[in-house]
């Protein structure tokens, strides 16, 4: 076991997570169509503060993230402060770590708490796949800049004459990695082939995810942590996630064609997480500050780790890299965990990470460790379903996982939970949570 790194303040306080909340998650272009991420963020933070009954002035910092950036609101965190009635002097800044963005936001607030610069803060993220920054071609962009500097009408007309019809076409946001040109689904296909993960295994995991998420809603387990969203024209509120298949059937999964490798692929729309809109946030405090305010924390942040790997091969193996580091820093082993929640970007990616966490060879030859991180116990894994069912508003998923895991730990009488995710750019994140 390597060095244990306790997350405590200089006074010995643990980092408490006192509350967490999210909007329902909605598939792209459905319930939240036309609602920008900043409005989703304001919605969830405003409701989180109202439910917690914590005075707004108690919150000294807000760190928030958004992956699909909107040029008109580059600092979503500050817009949330200004749009929710929070103290105007509240420090606020934005972060981005792709699919691990709200993990990063939580880590940043935790570091401020440990440094002693704040005693309470909010971390979270919001994304909209329905309100997108549609761009213009590089040629048109250059001409528009030059036109702005032109002094006469003839100069402007001459510049516009250089354009062709194709230059006027809108440019949608890129879905491929900037550095490689590969889509995440391409990497998921590569990992499925490399690690021998079959179509049947992927479909079975997706089916399991939907079944468990549907059961979680049916049992009322998510009611406390998901707000009701009222959206224009205010005729029908959104109460639950709208991606979950309550009648999920394995036979239906088998009918779908591959989405990326059309001839030989196994990754489909059904065994991948869909584009989603939503927001999530958590309130963090020092343990002593929570006691002063008479608050009972949901749990505590025990450790965290971020890793980075090559983007050309196995780019989505972030959990297999970051998990052993987070466990090491927490002073725990895989067998001591009560719950494991892994982000399901793709069923193939999830199954590959599970396989390698239990691989002695991967531990020795790739991680340089003496032993495997540990086998993933199915009875502890994604017990309420995962991102394939709930959906994945990129910057919000981490905060969803943290809140969901802490509530489930408390229902089980406490223990330790691992939350972990892969992210674009070969990034990985893992956090160990503790509940009493």
From Swiss-Prot:
EC number: 2.3.1.16
Catalysed conversion reaction: an acyl-CoA + acetyl-CoA = a 3-oxoacyl-CoA + CoA
GO cellular component term, pick one: cytosol
Functional pathway: Lipid metabolism; fatty acid beta-oxidation
Similarity-based family: Belongs to the thiolase-like superfamily. Thiolase family.
Class in the EC hierarchy, top level: transferase
Location within or outside the cell: Cytoplasm
Keyword Lipid metabolism: yes
Gene Ontology terms, MF aspect: acetyl-CoA C-acyltransferase activity
Cross-referenced Gene3D superfamilies: 3.40.47.10
Keywords assigned: Acyltransferase, Cytoplasm, Fatty acid metabolism, Lipid degradation, Lipid metabolism, Transferase
Active site residues per record: 99, 392, 422
Its job: Catalyzes the final step of fatty acid oxidation in which acetyl-CoA is released and the CoA ester of a fatty acid two carbons shorter is formed.
Biological process according to GO: fatty acid beta-oxidation
Name the UniProt record assigns to this protein: 3-ketoacyl-CoA thiolase
Organism: Shigella sonnei (strain Ss046)
Assembly: Heterotetramer of two alpha chains (FadJ) and two beta chains (FadI).
